[in-house]
A protein has these predicted regions:
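Active-site beta-loop-alpha junctions enriched in small/polar residues
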Residues: 1, 26-30, 73-75, 102-104, ...
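Short, acidic/polar
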Residues: 3-15, 80-86, 164-175, 257-264
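Catalytic domains of carbohydrate-active enzymes, especially glycoside hydrolases
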Residues: 10-26, 178
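Glycine-rich, proline-tolerant flexible connector loops at the mouths of alpha/beta enzymes
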Residues: 21-51, 105-113, 182-195
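Conserved, mostly hydrophobic/aromatic
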Residues: 23, 89, 176, 180, ...
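Active-site-adjacent beta->alpha loops and helix N-cap segments on the catalytic face
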Residues: 49-55, 79-81, 105-124, 139-140, ...
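Active-site pocket-lining/capping segments in soluble small-molecule metabolic enzymes
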Residues: 102, 115-148, 153-163, 169, ...
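Single conserved hydrophobic/aromatic residue that forms the stacking wall/gate
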Residues: 279-290
Length: 290
């Protein structure tokens, strides 16, 4: 969040102790606010009020020489705005991306693209593929870069909330792989069995790219209801029972870290490609998890 570059550096300085192989940089979609003009009239204003993903990625890469993976979204971006982001990243020699549809706007009940933007990540992949070939969104051509973008995509061990079934989810994941995705990062989960089952289902469907588990430590009692509602995932009964014994958030955080450590150890013992720790902007939490 927009707390200044020194706060960013403090966070990364803490993370460097663990020799991270890469750092993902999230992107926040633009949002709309409505200004009351009186007489029943409202003016809709589109706002971006956080430092740009490109700026954060460049700051980390240039200071620390750590691979950064900026997230590229359909959500809240037109095709031209996406092209501007790709041009800036290309100039900075930042070539690793995570390509996502992104979330609905806060006021939306269904996902709506921004202007001529995309409904699905696979459409965004096509724009990136064309960019790698030297083709702009308007069809004009540019010099092909010597360092093309490579990218991963998202996947959902407990099914995307909008997918009718897991088979449909796997069908579209395979399409994204065929379109050029080199790996996938999962939605967060708290039950490793669901990850292992999903990986086996993916293999059976002919999906053979690395599937990186996304892990988010549980840390507050309020997350007992917030996590299932926000991320559309289940919390295992054993985790819920332990959390309900907690008298405050400090105790809940300890339970969450212990659960996370157990998860990570089991995943690593099964030879996962890597671990993606989600929401680790609080630099002390990785210290506990380590």
């Amino acid at each position: 969040k927009g707390t200044g570059i020194e706060k960013l550096y403090q966070t990364v300085d803490t993370l460097r102790e663990f020799d991270p192989k890469y750092i993902n940089i999230t992107t926040h979609r633009s949002e709309y606010v409505y200004k009351d003009l009186g007489n029943g009239l409202f003016q809709r204003n589109r706002l971006r009020r956080r430092p740009g993903t490109v700026a954060v990625a460049a700051a980390i890469q240039n200071k620390y020489n750590i691979t950064v993976v900026p997230h590229i979204l359909c959500s809240g971006f037109t095709r031209e705005e996406t092209e501007y982001v790709l041009l800036d990243l290309q100039f900075l020699n930042i070539t690793d991306l995570l390509v996502l549809r992104g979330d609905k706007a806060k006021h939306e009940s269904v996902f709506t693209p921004e202007g001529d933007g995309y409904h699905h990540a696979i459409e965004l992949q096509e724009q990136i593929n064309n960019f790698n070939k030297g083709i702009f969104v308007d069809g004009s051509e540019m010099k092909v870069t010597a360092s093309p973008f490579s990218y991963g995509v998202a996947c959902y061990p407990e099914k995307h909330e909008e997918a009718p079934n897991i088979e449909s989810d796997l069908y579209w994941l395979k399409k994204k792989v065929e379109a050029g995705a080199e790996y996938a990062v999962t939605q967060l989960f708290y039950d490793n069995k669901k990850y292992f089952e999903f990986v086996e289902q993916a293999k059976a469907a002919g999906i053979n790219i690395p599937i990186i588990p996304g892990i988010k430590p549980f840390k507050k009692l309020s997350q007992l209801s917030m996590i299932p509602k926000t991320f559309k995932v289940d919390l295992p009964e054993d985790l819920v029972k332990e959390a309900l014994k907690c008298k405050n958030d400090a105790e809940a955080e300890r339970v969450g870290i212990e659960w996370c450590v157990t998860q990570c150890k089991e995943l690593m013992s099964h030879g996962v490609p890597s671990l993606s720790l989600i929401h680790i902007s609080e630099p002390t939490r990785p210290l506990y998890i380590s």
